[in-house]
From Swiss-Prot:
It comes from Phanerodontia chrysosporium (White-rot fungus). Gene3D superfamilies: 2.60.120.990, 2.80.10.50. This is Aldos-2-ulose dehydratase. Pathway: Carbohydrate metabolism; 1,5-anhydro-D-fructose degradation. The keyword Cell cycle does not apply.
Length: 900
């Protein structure tokens, strides 16, 4: 019945990493065609915020325009989201490209193949040129082009170090050697740069093998093999399946991973069409994903048995089909063009992305990008999530928009005349983020990830007002946020943060103690989130929006700070202060008063629940102005005010101390109220009525029970004026601290929990150590030769005076049904809120030093304590069911013994 702002039960083990959100952005629309996209770091010493190179194959009538799209996020304080095209060359039927610093001058050069022909049935007999375009070190067009070599049908290439590390090498593989010839094997070629790559000579050419219908070449750099390999490994995907080539210092070696899709009569395509290597934990080759076959419809993954050696070449691989996307067409092709591995969610294990060209007729399943995530390492099970529904012929991964570790995704529509032409070909990026912004009329919807399941920090500035830049921040568990000491402030919306200074440790949660007041200023250079992560508003100093005191509304102009990568509709918004008398809800009140409102920001979770975290809006009032007494009888939320500027230093919240019926909000008697002054950069605690354990009281209409209350600016002569400015955070109902504060009788830690006296012969246990939700919690009798007592982590729930009890091995929480039922049996679960349970326990100590665990107080129920049943467990003679019972039962005390 009562929602909470904490993101997960406090002592539940760290949640698995969830995929981030993706902010789509058009890089280039209106293209004539589309085939290749590549993330291109302009300099060789940095891969952050790379440019993008994209192009199509072109036609006989129109050469392909090779363009570098300059990343607008590569420079700080850039206000544009436009990717400026720089033409590098015009080529005939270019296919693949890669890059390397060939000249060793610190700038990456482009390596590209062209003169392919219009299709596999039209291979240029004297084509298949491999060239490099020299980077001039500045954003200049028409880069100097030099030839590396030739081989008809040249289709894929990668730069690396395959037999030596002192110069750039290129592995290049044709797909076929002649028009319509699907049977003759093509050479696998290594080109090695000469001493002077700017000379006109061709590069040294070595043939290291032959393969059939190779559609994809990938490399595993030696630097990523944890010292296992001296040189880069080459992954080939073609009719022969998926295999690995590498040079061992003496000779070339081959390891066949798998043969891929089996051959079928009448189908010219079998084997594989694309492959990529995925890291799992400490193994750089935990799995190998594959698209099958040439332009196929099958997604497969190769796995190796548990305990196998790390890497590719010392393991035996087994193929598993994950998905088949629709039937093949009459030409035996489907919609899959590429697979790519990258750590999309930041958990240290790679996901893999599947590029889907599209279908005719259009098909949601076969268009865009799918992301496969490993969810069960033991059984190598994957989940599947749609990232984009825009045609994707190729995928490039990089961090395109920040200096962090997030992985963004770039795609280009597949549009090849005479084969498959997607409508409206375009290049797009999908920027990894924890926050998405969307315009809602005059307000903004900010959708955020669950902090406990993200591995990336996200900061989004959104408003500059009253001398502060307001920034929404999502912090993963145990994450650090650098701030400006004694200047920056934080208002926590979910989770916990803490910092330390010379006075000790300071913790902030969504609400301080009821009717209290607390500073938001951080007295340290950084703060850290707790194990559940945190979502907060960071107040940073601003030189744009003035400094208090604010003498007129002209000094309180609010500035839109949304970053360039959010939708233009959000960036174009104005956030005016509106006189409250002009708001439709004023109904004639506040006439001629210096009382203004600025709306507003909805913060919701970006999952299927779409649960509300808070609504945020700003208010300002001049000297002597009352914001009007009210009690939220028509809306249910818990409101916290965070003051940016207190004009007189005397403004704050007043609330009625008499029964509601005895208070006249239109003509208030201030002697019937109490005041809490809320100074600059302070927030007040809950003003709503709560039960003793911190749950909000509800009225008959399910609204939060508030006394009459109002913000009253300090009294005085408004000449000169001095405005109060505060931010209202309107939360759904949540639990807070107990009233009055109980004594702290228990130190969080790991314990064996024994029933009654510590020498008693029964201890708290989860049946069979079973992590399944709903597993009974028992009191196990100690028997000779039996197992040791199970260990439990007892943890204080931040922002409350309650505790949780989590099984040390499984993470299951000791839970009871909510609303509570007397004599109910207690069970272990990981998701109490979703199952109508509570995991909260109040803790007291009796005169013998024994502990009692009590459920939170609830309407129509007396105290209910964690206890044991008088009836033995039916299936286990040595077990007693654990239940909740009333306070008339003597058997409700427990003893705690520290455990390892």
């Amino acid at each position: 019945m009562y929602s909470k702002v904490f993101l997960k039960p406090h002592c539940e083990p760290e949640q698995p990493a969830a995929l981030p959100l993706f902010q789509p952005q058009l890089v280039q629309g209106g293209r004539p065609d589309g085939y290749w996209v590549e993330a291109f770091p302009f300099r060789s010493d940095s891969s952050k915020c790379p440019n993008i190179i994209g192009y199509g194959l072109g036609t006989y009538d129109m050469k392909s325009d090779i363009q570098m799209l300059v990343n607008p996020y590569a420079t700080t304080n850039n206000q544009s989201s436009s990717w400026t095209p720089v033409p590098l060359a015009k080529l005939d039927f270019p296919v693949a490209m890669h890059y390397a610093d060939i000249t060793k001058n610190g700038f990456n050069d482009v390596i590209i193949t062209d003169q392919y022909g219009s299709s596999m049935d039209d291979i240029w007999a004297y084509g298949g040129r491999v060239s490099w375009l020299e980077n001039p070190g500045e954003l200049r067009d028409n880069w100097t082009m030099r030839t590396i070599g030739h081989s008809p049908g040249m289709h894929r290439l990668k730069a690396g170090h395959f037999t030596r590390t002192d110069r750039v090498q290129v592995v290049a593989v044709p797909i076929v050697v002649a028009s319509s010839d699907l049977t003759t094997p093509a050479d696998v070629i290594i080109f090695t740069a000469p001493d002077d790559p700017r000379s006109e000579q061709l590069w040294q050419r070595d043939v290291v093998g032959t393969r059939h219908l190779v559609h994809e070449v990938a490399i595993v750099p030696a630097a990523e093999t944890d010292g296992e390999m001296r040189f880069d490994q080459i992954i080939l995907a073609g009719r022969d399946g998926v295999d690995c080539l590498w040079y061992d210092g003496a000779r070339w070696q081959r390891h066949l991973v798998g043969t891929g899709l089996p051959e079928e009569r009448g189908d010219p395509y079998w084997g594989a069409g694309s492959a990529a290597v995925g890291r799992v934990g400490d193994d750089y080759a935990g799995y190998i994903c594959s698209a099958e076959a040439f332009h196929g419809n099958t997604v497969s993954v190769y796995t190796k048995p548990a305990g196998s050696p790390t890497g590719i070449v010392r393991a035996e691989w087994t193929r598993h089909v994950l998905d088949v996307f629709g039937p093949l067409n009459g030409k035996h092709t489907g919609s899959i063009h590429q697979v790519v591995c990258a750590d999309i969610d930041g958990d240290g294990e790679d996901e893999f992305l599947v590029a889907m060209m599209g279908a005719d007729p259009p098909d949601f399943q076969r268009t865009g990008v799918w992301c496969y995530k490993l969810v069960d390492r033991t059984n190598m099970k994957f989940s599947k999530t749609k990232v984009s529904s825009v045609s994707a012929g190729r995928i490039a991964t990089a961090n395109f928009h920040s200096q962090g570790s997030e992985v963004d995704i770039a795609t280009i529509s597949y549009s090849v005349p005479g084969y498959f032409e997607s409508p409206n070909p375009s290049i797009n990026v999908f920027l990894s983020t924890g926050i998405l912004a969307e315009r809602l009329d005059e307000e903004v919807m900010l959708r955020v990830v669950r902090a406990g399941s993200t591995r990336f920090k996200t900061e989004m500035e959104f408003l500059d007002v009253a001398g502060k830049k307001l920034t929404l921040v999502v912090l993963p568990p145990f994450a650090r946020l650098d701030v400006e000491r004694n200047v920056s402030g934080v208002k926590v919306m979910a989770g916990t943060v803490c910092w330390a200074d010379e006075n000790g440790k300071h913790e902030r949660v969504p609400a301080t103690r009821p009717f209290g007041c607390e500073s938001m200023i951080v007295s340290a250079d950084y703060l850290e989130s707790g194990e559940e992560g945190a979502i907060l508003v960071l107040y940073k100093p601003s030189s744009t929006s003035g400094r208090p005191p604010f003498r007129s509304m002209d000094e309180l102009v609010a500035h839109n700070l949304f970053p360039a990568y959010v939708p233009d509709s959000v960036r174009a918004m104005k956030f005016p202060w509106v006189r409250c008398a002009d708001r439709p809800w004023a109904h004639g009140r506040f006439k001629d008063l210096d009382f203004f409102n600025l709306i507003g920001f909805h913060v919701n979770f970006a999952d299927d629940s779409a649960a509300v975290l808070a609504h945020v809006q700003l208010w300002t009032a001049g000297i002597g102005v009352s914001a009007g007494f009210h009690n939220h009888v028509e809306a249910s939320f818990c409101e916290i005010h965070a003051c940016i500027a207190n004009g007189t230093g005397r403004g704050g919240m007043r609330w009625a101390t008499v029964p509601d019926a005895n208070f006249n909000p239109d003509s208030p008697n201030l002697e019937d109220t109490e005041l809490i002054v809320v100074p600059d950069m302070h927030e007040h605690g809950p003003l709503w009525r709560t039960r003793p354990d911190g749950h909000p009281l509800l009225r008959m209409n399910d609204t939060i029970d508030y006394p009459w209350h109002a913000w009253l600016a300090g009294a005085g002569n408004p000449s000169p004026q001095a405005f109060d400015v505060w931010v209202a955070f309107e939360f759904p109902g949540f639990e807070t601290f107990s009233t009055p504060p109980p004594p702290r009788v228990l130190e969080p830690g790991r314990y064996a929990i024994r029933f009654g006296d510590p020498h008693q012969t029964a201890s708290l246990a989860l049946q069979k150590n079973d992590a399944t939700d709903g597993t009974p919690v028992l009191a196990l009798l100690d028997l000779d030769g039996g197992p040791s007592p199970q260990a439990w982590n007892i943890s204080h729930v931040p922002g409350t005076d309650m505790y949780e009890i989590a099984h040390a091995k499984t993470g299951s929480l000791v839970c009871a049904r909510w609303p509570p039922v007397k004599n109910q049996r207690v069970a272990g679960t990981h998701s109490p809120a979703a199952m109508g349970l509570t995991s909260r326990w109040a803790v007291t100590k009796n005169t013998k030093g024994q502990i009692t665990f009590r459920l939170p107080e609830a309407p129509d129920h007396g105290p209910l304590f964690l206890s044991v049943s008088a009836i033995r467990h039916q299936q286990e003679a040595d077990a007693i069911p654990v239940i909740v019972q009333g306070d008339s039962i003597e058997l409700s005390a427990w003893s705690l013994v520290p455990a390892n």
